[in-house]
Structures are given as C-alpha cells and as structure tokens.
Curated annotation (Swiss-Prot):
<feature type="compositionally biased region" description="Polar residues">
    <location>
        <begin position="1"/>
        <end position="11"/>
    </location>
</feature>
<feature type="domain" description="KH 9">
    <location>
        <begin position="724"/>
        <end position="766"/>
    </location>
</feature>
<feature type="domain" description="KH 14">
    <location>
        <begin position="1126"/>
        <end position="1168"/>
    </location>
</feature>
<feature type="domain" description="KH 4">
    <location>
        <begin position="360"/>
        <end position="402"/>
    </location>
</feature>
<keyword id="KW-0677">Repeat</keyword>
<dbReference type="GO" id="GO:0003729">
    <property type="term" value="F:mRNA binding"/>
</dbReference>
<dbReference type="InterPro" id="IPR004088">
    <property type="entry name" value="KH_dom_type_1"/>
</dbReference>
<feature type="domain" description="KH 5">
    <location>
        <begin position="431"/>
        <end position="473"/>
    </location>
</feature>
<feature type="domain" description="KH 13">
    <location>
        <begin position="1051"/>
        <end position="1093"/>
    </location>
</feature>
<feature type="domain" description="KH 2">
    <location>
        <begin position="219"/>
        <end position="260"/>
    </location>
</feature>
<feature type="compositionally biased region" description="Basic and acidic residues">
    <location>
        <begin position="933"/>
        <end position="947"/>
    </location>
</feature>
<dbReference type="Pfam" id="PF00013">
    <property type="entry name" value="KH_1"/>
</dbReference>
<keyword id="KW-0963">Cytoplasm</keyword>
<feature type="domain" description="KH 3">
    <location>
        <begin position="291"/>
        <end position="333"/>
    </location>
</feature>
<feature type="domain" description="KH 7">
    <location>
        <begin position="577"/>
        <end position="619"/>
    </location>
</feature>
<feature type="domain" description="KH 11">
    <location>
        <begin position="872"/>
        <end position="913"/>
    </location>
</feature>
<feature type="domain" description="KH 12">
    <location>
        <begin position="970"/>
        <end position="1012"/>
    </location>
</feature>
C-alpha cells in the first residue's frame, strides 16, 4: 500500500513518476492557471485505500469551489523511494535497523516529523510534516541517506558559474534544497567548466535544467569595452551627461564612462546583445564624427584662474560645452602648466575662447595688509564681523593665513573691491584702539596662571577686558600673548608678571613627620591644621593618605613662607615628641579615690597644673593599679614624684633601694613581669620599681608601708643571690579551680609554703594559655620540698569530705539572691566546694552543708562566718533621687549599678515604678531639688516628704553605704538648652533619625528636638552627665555651622541663566545620545534644561542653565560657540537613488557614520513615505559639503551597478505566467466532476484484493494509514 499527501504542485510533479499507481490528495494549489482545466481527480484526489470511504460525503461543486485555500504554516509532503533505489532493504520488522536510527537523527536535526510506511511492492513511502524550511531540509537528508545516489555533470561557460552560486552562495543553497541534490562547482582557479550534480534521477534532471536556464539567460546579456581617446569623452557624455543618458534610455544599455579624474580610456557597455550593439555603434559614430570635425587651440590662463574656468563641480566647463559644443581641457592641479586646450569645431572655437576668458576674469584676488594678531578681532566672536561682509556678498571668499600679516579676498571683481575697502576700515580702527603685549613665563607655571577651571585667567580677562593666549602644554612654549584695550593690556601684563614672579619664588619642601603624629597635628575635625593654614595662608600643606603609611608631609608656597611654616611645624613635632614621653605610676588600691578626688577634681587639677595627659586604670580586682601619665619627660617624672608623694603622705610609705646587678633585672622581672608580680602579690601592698633598660643602673626601688618593706627587699636579694649561684625550676599541674585555695586568702597558704621551703611559686595569669601549669623556682632542695608540699595540698583537695555549720535562717536569703551569686563566688574561691542550704518547706532549719576537699571546706566555713558577721553589722540607708532619673542611673542593662555594687560591697534596691501617679499641678521643690510626692491617699501626704517611688535603698556597712550614695548622686543627669534655628532641626535629626542618634551615641547624652508643630521654638534640650554635656553642646554647634555653610552653598548654586537658541539647533547641542550636552554639564558643573516640545506654554527657544554664576556663564559661552559654528554651516539637497540608501548607510549606520566623521558633515536620509525618496540632505561647512556629496555620488554609481544586476536576476527568477496574471480570472474550473456526469461505474467488489489491497501482514483493524502518531 502506498499513500501520499502533497501540499505543493511542484512536489506533486517532482514525485509523480514514482507514484503513478498511487492516488494523490492535493491540499494546496499553485497560483498559476493553465489553459486546460485539471480533471476532478487531479484537483481532488481521494483518500488512501484503507481510509473510510468519503465519496458519499462529497458535495457538489458550488460557489465555495471558487475560493482558493489559504496556505498553512505547517505542510506535509510524501516522498516515495522505489525498492531498487532503497539503501537499506534487509528489515525483519517495521521501524527497526539502521533506517529507523537515520530517521530519528533527521527529525532531531531538522525539527520535522517523519512517518514511514511500506507499499506492497516493498517501496518506501515517507511522510514529512513541519514548516516548509524544515520539510525541505528533511527531504534533502532523506534523499541523501535513504536513497541510492546517482551523479551527472553539466557544462556551462566558466563566467556563468558565479550566477549559479549567487550572492554569498544563497542561490546555490536554494537550488540544492529545491532539487534535493548536491551541486559541486569547480573553484575559480580550476579551468574546468563541468558542474557535478549528485542525487536522485529526478533531482539531477531538475537541477540540470535549472542550471542550463541560468546559463541561457546570461547568454542573452553581453558586456563590451570600447577604447575611446580620453579627450573625446566629454562629447560622448554631452553637457551635464545628457547625451549618454538619452542613449542609455533609448537602448536600455548601461554605459559607464570613466570620470575625468580617472585616467582610463575604456567605455563599458552592459545589456542585451542587440541593444548593446546599437549603443556601441552610436558611440562609435559620435567618436568618428568628432575626430574628423574637431580641431584644437591652446591658450595661456593663469594657474590661479583655472578653478574659475572649471567652476563649482565643473559646472563652468559643462556650461561652455552646452553653449558652444567645445570641450575645454584643463591641466591637472599637480601640474605647473598654464596651457588650456579648447577642442571643437573651428567655427565655434572663437565663441568658446571668449567664454573661457570671461570665466577666468570674472573673479579676482586681492590682499589687505593686517597684523596677524588682529585677524581674530576682524573675524569676530563666532565669525560675526566677517559674516556681515559675506552675507552682503555671498560669492566672495576671504582667507586668513596663520602667521602672515595679510588677508586675501577672492571673488567677483566688484565684490572684492567693496570687501577690501571694508576690511581696510576695520584694520585701521582696530590698530587705533587695540594693542598687544608678549611676555615670557616658564611653561611649567602656565597651569598655575590659568588656575583651577581657568579661574585666574578668566578673572584677568573679565577685569581688564583683554584676551590672553597661553600656549598648550605640548608646545613647551614660554610666550604668552595679551591682546585688547591698550590700558587693559598693560595692567594684565603687570599682574601676570607679578604672579609669575611669585611662582618662581615658590618652592616645595618635604617634611618628615612620623605618621602617628599626623592626626594630632590635624586635630579634631581639622581644627589645628586650620589654625596653621590661617597663620600661613600662602602655604599649601598636604598630608599623605593614611593607607599609604607614609611619613612625608609636603609644603608648597613662597620660599620664605615655606621656611617659616617648616620651622613652626618642626617645633610643633618636637613638642609632640617631647610630650609623648609616658610612664606608669603604681598606686595602692585604697588610695585610688583619694588621688582622683571627688568627681575627678584632684586628678583634673593635677592635669591642668602639669599640662600632661593622665589615663586612669580600670576597676579590676587587683591590690594595686597603674596610672599612665604622658607629657614632657621632665614634667612626667616630676608628676610621678608628686603622685607618689601624695600616696606616701596618705599611707606613710617608705622607700628602700636595693642594689641588684642590671644583668639580673630581666630574670627577676620574668616573662611579662610574672615573677616580680608574684613577689609584690606575696608581700601585699608593695611596689618594686626597676630602672629603665639600658641605663646601666643597678638600683631597684621598693615602696611599701614601714613594716612591710623588709620582706620584699629580702626576697629580691635572696633571689638575686640564688640566681647568681644556682637556679632550679620544676613545673607542677593542678586544676584551675584549686589555684585560689592553694594561694589562700591574701596569699596566706602559698606564703606559708614559700616561707617553709624558700622556693618561688608562680601561678598562671588569666592571659596564659596553659591554666593548669604552676612553676616552682629556687634551689634544687627548696624546689623539691615545695613540690612535695604542693602535691600534698593537691592530693588533699582531691579527697572529698562533707561537713556542716549553723547559719541563722534569716541570713539564708543573702546567699541565694541574684541566682546564688554569693555561693558561686565561694565555690570559685575555695576549690569548687559545694554549699547546700536547707530546702524543706515549713521548717526553719539552720543547718548548712558543705562538701569538698577538707581544706577547702574549712576555708569556706571561715568565709561564710565572715559574711554572717558583715550581715549582722549591716545598715540600710535611703537615697532620694526622682524616679525619672532611675533608668539613666542604672545604665545599659544595669551596668552602672553593678559597678557601684562591686566597688563598694553594698546592695542597692530600686523602688517599683509608680504605674498611676496622681496628677500634681505644682510639685513642691525641696532644698535638694527633688520633687515632692503624695501619699497613698493623696490627701494627708506631706508635701515636703519624698515620694516612695523616688527612694533607693542601699544596704551594707555604714561607711560603704555613704560612699555608694555619693556615687549614685553623681550619676543624676543634668539638662541644658541650646538655641538652634528651627529650619535646621530636620537636618540635625537626619534621615530616619540617623544624625541625632549618631550624636547621642557619640556623646552619651539624650537630645530632645521640639516637635514640628512648635515652629516658633528654636530650643534643643540636651540631657546627660555633666562631664558629657559640654562636649555634646560643642558638637551640636559645630554641626549647625556645617549646615549653615551648606545652605549658603545651595543658594550660590541655584543661580539661573536663560539662553535664546533657535530650536533647530537643539539636537546638535544635545548631541548623539546626549554626549555633547553631558560634556558641557560635567565640565562646568551646571544643570541645563531644554524646553519641553509638548508644552506649548514654554518658549521653545529658551534654554535654562542652573549652577554657580561663573559656571553658568561659561556653559552659556560654550553653547553659543556651538551655535556660532552651526550658523556657518550650509545644507544642500542631493538626488541619490533610494535603492542604494541602505548600502550607503551600512549595518547599524556604521558606513554613514564613517563618512560623516571623515568629512565632518551631517547626512540625513528621507523617511519612509517622504514625497521625494531620493532626496538626501547634507549639512556642514561649504567645502566639506561639496567633498561629501562628490563621495556619495561616486558610491551611488558603484552600487547602482550591483542593483541593476540583482533586478535583472529577480526578473528572470519570476514565474513565466507574470503577464498572464493580468487576464481576468475565470474562477476555479475542473473537468469530469462527478456532479456533472452520469456515474455508470459499478460498485467495487468488497472481496477483491485488487480493489481493496492490504498490507502483507495482519494488522489491527483501527491502524491509521500512516502509522501511530508519535
């Protein structure tokens, strides 16, 4: 069985030979109409044999039969491969083997859908569905891979091969697709003319036919070259090319005459052979006729007048040729010859000669003497002065030669005389009222004379109304020229020389200052460096970038000022170095607050008197602290003695000096001071001071109370003696929680071991990595004895015992408050001992159980007993502070209260917050400034008594409670008011409050800004500790100054200027993608606004410039300069065949942009739908426009040749029925339709296999004709 579905008539005709026995269904018809109408069966083939019978459903033809079907985007074609041409014949089952793989590969490559079926004769039918392009590609693949291939050759002339290939090989590819063949064309360097075709027989025949058709078409056309002497070309072309144009129009032949600038004699003819022969004959006739009749005469014309004879674009020569029929031959421009040859008929040469002399003498050249420096004044701003002359006399050309003292005028004689008189008057006037001066200034100073953005030179120009020309840097010239009013020139010259003299006296000096001092010299917010710059205003001081880690500070300015500034800064640095000497002063913990004083009064006084910086220590739990003092060495040392004297006076301190060799000092101090620290801790309240390293001094100073200095002195001396004789070290390990117990309270336990053995025992500090390592140092005997004692202590700590003691139940709460903090401290201090309080509810047990190492338990019991004694002696006092300050006093997460509690060993309890305080109209003020409160009832409350919510309870020993009360009262915040203009409030607050938050965090205060509704209020409230208020106020006022400066700058920047510019120039000022206007905006830092085209209320010629006044004026001048250049431009329309527009423009406009950039012109092509599609407008300077037009006309001539060839090829490729399509359509006609004939055929025999053929194998009854859908 075979079934086909063909959508195009070409496909039907192509495969008809292989499907003669098959019934064909045509689903789309070709648009061509033939003379003989098709039969009904040809037009409407029945469905395949196995399909349900549709004949009964056929309707008679009616009006609908005349409507032609619309072509579908998806088409279906069927290809039949006969058994003898199949590549793969051995198939056991349908769809298996190599054939199935090839079909899958074709579907993947092309995107088309393939279905295979086998006919009874084992021929292969392939149905291909998809888009037309995909179907054609699949067809080519099927023929190449599933059908055996044949090959044939066809011979055509070698010159016709390129027409078979087509542009970029497109025609060859299309031919291969249509014929499903492979066509091989020999290479250009191969002399063979044989073209090889590979494919099916039908495809080869069709391809061969198409190739021969192309060759035959080219045989009809011919190209001929005729050699004609160059001098006779003008006669053949005729005036303005009229003669050759008429000839081309009459004969339909294309004639190419080389232009006069090209030294070629060949004239090329292209066209149909007969018409071409006519054109060649007519040209030969003209040539022979002119050769016989013409003669020549030679005349001498000045070389400078040749261009007048030629005229613009050769118009004068064409004019003479048209009037007289005489050709005028002008020697080339690079030739020195002045001979002009006239060629023509003798009787017309006289008239032509008259015309030549008339053209030559119609123009004259004249020159006016004028100093070259006056040229630009004669031209005027944007050529305004010169334009007055050229507008009156447009044919005149005025030329200024740089460096020459003359002005050349060229044009009609009368116009030149008038222009010469006007220029002479202008020159005389300018010489009387202008002057110039030249000065020599080293070019390295030129940019300083110009100033930033031309500030200096523009000021001089505006002030003295002069023009100053400073040569560019690349010229390396020292000459500066000043031109303008005589008095202004002299004043400008004087000022420029003064500036240059000052700069020559200027010098640059590098100052070496350590980077660590840079920030100090600059000062907070640049205050100190501002003072230096105010003191030396002519000196520029440049500090290096902090990231560069450079010590070089650069000073630039007048020599004397730089020297003074250098000495001043060197002195400042010397003071900083001198004041950077620092020393640590050890003080005993108990005297710390006495030396600092209440509220830091004492230490502040010491700072002011000594002019030094003193850093206070942290509040760590050490027995002694270090004050860090920084300033002059001598002052710091005196200050150290002064602080130590205060301490000595307070505690009656004794100073003892011990002589220890300096070489042993480092060993005695130990790594990071560990060893000497252990001695000081052991002796308690002792300071040991070593001399500075490298001093060579052997004196070690010990400061201690009168009765305690002997022991540290003895320890130091003993250790030094042992070190000199013998030293022995042993490491011991113990759990960190045992260390405190091993040391004992106040170092009692470890002191006992040291006294017994004489060994030094060093425990790890919190900074050491190994927290279990204990080091024992001394003689071997002492170290071993100390090791035994410590090991025994550690062993005892490992032996856990349980003990109990009696504690009054009223004190139990003290041990468990704050999540059992007291119990945790006892456990940490005494080797992790566990203390358990009674938990039985309803009983008042006083028994407390302790569990741990025996020694630890005993020590813990002693500590608990001490705590109980303190609780028995505890008192409670009240501190009245208004509740509104409680949160501030507590600090973040209660940190301030926790610190006071630790420092003074007291407990502090704040009252509950009062949820609904009774309203008080006028709260009474107490003498201490606290607000009065009311009682619970609000009636009987004493106005003078404090409110309950204001009372803070402090518990502890009386003296400690009083000290804690003073510390609390010192934390009460103070409020001050600062006056700030209301309009600055929103800037101080910042975006989403960021500005005010930053200030509050920086100065640790609360800043309250009045609400926006209170517009009359300028008061900002600052609340915080007294010490922070001054800094906060200064910071706020500094911010106000910055904001006011910004406001002034905004006002200056809002200056507006309006420029009147014709709207037609706006696109040029804006530039491509806004490039020109963006450059002006960026260069002058201004905003430029163009009028809105859609807004009729706006003046369309007004451009608004906003910015600083000077910048706005400079931007205006830049815009007017562009406008001046645009006004000098001209626009010319040139007729350019619209068919070559696309090629001249190029891909994405690249080609036309290149032409515009080369000739500096603007070229505009007509838009689609324009009245004249060939009109192209060229805009630019006159000489550039002429050159650009000549260039694009040459391109047109070159590209039109290709256009003509392409059009001729397209005409050939069109179907032959083009002319027949003009005949009115007869409608759709078929012959032998069933509705028009009597059906005498008998019904088919259902049992006949001839009428109803079937597949060889049994198949399912519902199988579709083309197999299952995939």
């Amino acid at each position: 069985m075979s079934s086909v579905a063909v959508l195009t008539q070409e496909s039907f005709a192509e495969h008809r030979s292989g499907l003669t026995q098959q019934q064909v269904k045509v689903t789309a018809l070709n648009s061509e109409e033939e003379n003989d109408p098709p039969t009904y069966k040809e037009a409407f083939p029945p469905l395949p044999e196995k399909a349900p019978c549709l004949e009964a459903a056929q309707e008679p033809s009616g009006p609908w039969s005349k409507i032609r079907p619309i072509k579908a985007s998806v088409i279906t074609q069927v290809f039949h491969v006969p058994l003898e041409e199949r590549k793969y014949k051995d198939m056991n089952q349908f769809g298996e083997g190599e054939q199935a793989k090839i079909c899958l590969d074709i579907m993947q490559k092309t995107g088309a859908h393939l279905e295979l079926s086998l006919a009874k004769d084992q021929g292969l039918s392939i149905m291909v569905s998809g888009k037309l392009e995909a179907v054609m590609k699949a067809r080519k693949e099927i023929v190449a891979r599933l059908q055996t291939q044949a090959s044939a050759t066809v011979a055509i002339p070698k010159e016709h091969h390129r027409f078979v290939i087509g542009k970029n090989g497109e025609k060859l590819q299309d031919l291969e697709l249509k014929t499903a063949t492979k066509i091989q064309i020999p290479r250009p360097d191969d002399p063979s003319n044989q073209i090889k075709i590979t494919g099916t027989k039908e495809g080869i025949e069709k391809a061969r036919h198409e190739i021969l058709l192309i060759s035959a078409e080219q045989d009809k056309r011919a190209v001929e070259r005729l050699d004609v002497e160059k001098v006779y070309h003008p006669f053949i072309a005729g005036p303005y090319n009229k003669l050759v144009s008429e000839l081309m129009q009459d004969t339909g032949t294309r004639i190419n005459i080389p232009p006069p600038s090209v030294n070629k004699t060949e004239i090329v003819f292209t066209g149909e052979k007969e018409q071409l022969a006519q054109a060649v004959a007519r040209v030969k006739k003209i040539y022979e006729e002119k050769k016989k009749k013409t003669t020549t005469i030679a005349v001498e014309v000045k070389k400078s007048q040749h261009k007048y004879v030629i005229g613009r674009k050769g118009n004068s020569l064409q004019e003479i040729l048209e009037k007289t029929g005489v050709s005028v031959e002008i020697p080339p421009t690079d030739s020195s010859s002045e001979t002009v040859i006239l060629r023509g008929e003798p009787e017309k040469l006289g008239q032509a000669l008259t015309e030549v002399y008339a053209k030559a003498n119609s123009f004259t050249v004249s020159s006016v003497s004028a100093p070259s420096w006056l040229h630009r004044f004669i031209i005027g701003l944007f050529g305004q002065n010169l334009a007055k002359i050229t507008q009156q006399m447009p044919k005149i050309h005025i030329e200024f030669t740089e460096g020459e003292d003359k002005i050349t005028s060229e044009g009609p004689t009368e116009d030149v005389n008038v222009a010469q008189e006007q220029i002479e008057v202008m020159v005389k006037d300018l010489i009387n009222r202008t002057d110039y001066a030249e000065i020599n200034v080293d070019h390295k100073f030129h940019r300083h004379l110009i100033g930033k953005n031309g500030a200096n030179i523009n000021r001089i120009k505006d002030l003295y109304k002069v023009s100053v020309r400073i040569p560019p840097d690349n010229e390396k010239s020292n000459l500066i020229r000043i031109e303008g009013d005589p008095q202004g020139v002299q004043q400008a010259k004087k000022e420029l020389l003064e500036l240059a003299s000052r700069m020559e006296n200027e010098r640059t000096k590098d100052l070496i200052i350590e980077q660590k001092f840079h920030r100090t010299i600059i000062g907070q917010k640049g205050e100190r460096i501002r003072e230096i710059r105010e003191k030396f205003p002519e000196v520029i001081i440049n500090f290096p970038d902090p990231a560069h880690k450079s010590d070089i500070v650069q000073l630039r300015g007048p020599k004397n000022e730089v020297e003074k500034c250098t000495k001043y800064m060197q002195k400042m640095v010397a003071d900083l170095v001198e004041n950077s000497f620092s020393i640590s002063v050890p003080i005993f913990k108990q005297f710390h607050k006495n030396i600092i004083g209440k509220g830091g009064a004492n230490i502040k006084k010491i700072r002011e008197e000594s002019n030094t910086k003193i850093d206070l220590p942290g509040r760590e739990q050490a027995t002694q602290r270090q004050l860090l003092s920084q300033g002059r060495e001598q002052t710091v040392k005196l200050l150290r003695h002064r602080i130590l004297a205060i301490q000595k006076e307070l505690a009656n301190i004794t100073e003892v000096e011990v002589s220890i060799p300096s070489k042993l000092h480092n060993s005695l101090i130990g790594a990071k001071g560990r060893f000497i620290r252990s001695i000081m801790e052991e002796c308690g309240g002792v300071h040991i001071h070593f001399p500075t390293e490298g001093s060579g001094s052997a004196t070690v100073t010990i400061r201690a109370q009168p009765r305690t200095w002997r022991k540290p002195r003895s320890s130091c001396c003993t250790w030094a003696e042992e070190k000199q004789t013998k030293s022995y070290t042993v490491d011991l390990r113990a759990k960190p929680e045992y260390h405190k117990f091993l040391i004992g309270k106040g170092g009692g336990n470890i002191r006992k071991v040291r006294d017994n053995t004489g060994a030094r025992i060093i425990f790890p500090t919190s900074e050491d990595k190994d927290q279990e390592l204990i080091t024992i140092m001394g003689t071997e005997e002492a170290v071993k004895e100390a090791q035994k004692e410590l090991e025994a202590l550690i062993k005892n700590l490992d032996n856990v015992v349980e003990d109990s003691m009696v504690v009054d139940p009223k004190h139990h709460r003290h041990f468990v408050i704050r999540r059992g903090q007291v119990l945790r401290e006892i456990a940490d201090e005494y080797g992790g001992v566990m203390v358990r309080l009674p938990t039985v509810s309803g009983t008042q047990s006083d028994k407390v159980t302790l569990k741990g190492a025996k020694d630890c338990v005993e020590a813990a019991k002693k500590r608990i007993q001490e705590i109980i004694e303190d609780l028995e002696a505890q008192v409670t006092i009240e501190c009245t502070i208004p509740q509104k300050f409680h949160r501030s006093i507590m600090g973040p997460k209660g940190s301030r209260i926790q610190q006071i509690t630790r420092d003074y060993g007291v407990q502090i309890k704040f009252p509950d917050r009062e949820e609904n305080p009774a309203p008080v109209a006028e709260p009474a003020l107490q003498e201490n400034g606290e607000e009065g409160g009311e009682g619970k009832d609000g009636k009987d409350a004493d106005p003078s008594s404090p409110r309950k919510c204001d009372i803070i309870i402090i518990s502890g020993r009386r003296e400690k409670c009083e000290a804690a009360k003073e510390a609390l009262q010192a934390l009460v915040p103070v409020t001050i008011e600062v006056e700030v203009p209301f309009d600055l409030h929103r800037y101080i607050i910042g975006q989403k409050g960021s500005g005010i938050r930053k200030m509050m965090d920086e100065f640790e205060v609360n800043i309250q800004v009045p609400a926006p509704e209170l517009q009359s209020s300028d008061i900002i409230t600052i609340t915080g500790l007294a010490a922070n208020l001054d800094r906060a106020k200064a910071g706020l006022l500094e911010r106000v100054k910055e904001l006011q400066a910004e406001q002034e700058d905004r006002a200056l920047r809002s200056f507006k200027l309006t420029v009147t510019v014709d709207p037609k120039y706006h696109p040029k000022i804006i530039g491509r993608k806004g490039a020109v206007i963006t450059q002006i905006r960026t260069e002058h830092e201004v905003n430029i606004q163009f009028p809105d085209k859609d807004d009729e209320s706006q003046a369309q010629d007004q451009i608004t410039i906003t910015g600083y006044e000077k910048n706005a004026e400079a931007a205006r001048d830049a815009i007017m300069k562009i406008v001046g250049e645009l006004e000098q431009m001209v626009s010319e329309d040139v007729t350019l065949d619209h068919r070559v527009h696309a090629r001249i423009i190029g891909a994405r406009g690249k080609a036309i942009r290149k032409i515009m950039d080369e000739f500096k012109v603007d070229i505009r092509f007509p838009q689609s739908g324009a009245p004249d599609p060939n009109c192209v407008t060229v805009t630019g300077l006159p000489e550039n426009v002429e050159e650009a037009i000549d260039h694009i006309l040459n391109l047109e001539e070159e590209y039109l040749a290709d256009v003509v060839d392409n059009e001729a090829m397209q005409v050939y490729m069109k179907p032959s029925s083009h002319e027949e399509s003009k005949v009115p359509s007869k409608g759709f006609v078929v012959r032998d339709a069933p509705c028009g004939t009597v059906n005498n055929e008998k019904a088919p025999d259902m049992s006949s296999s001839e009428d109803f053929p079937s597949f060889g194998a049994q198949v399912a009854p519902k199988t579709l004709p083309w197999g299952p859908k995939r």
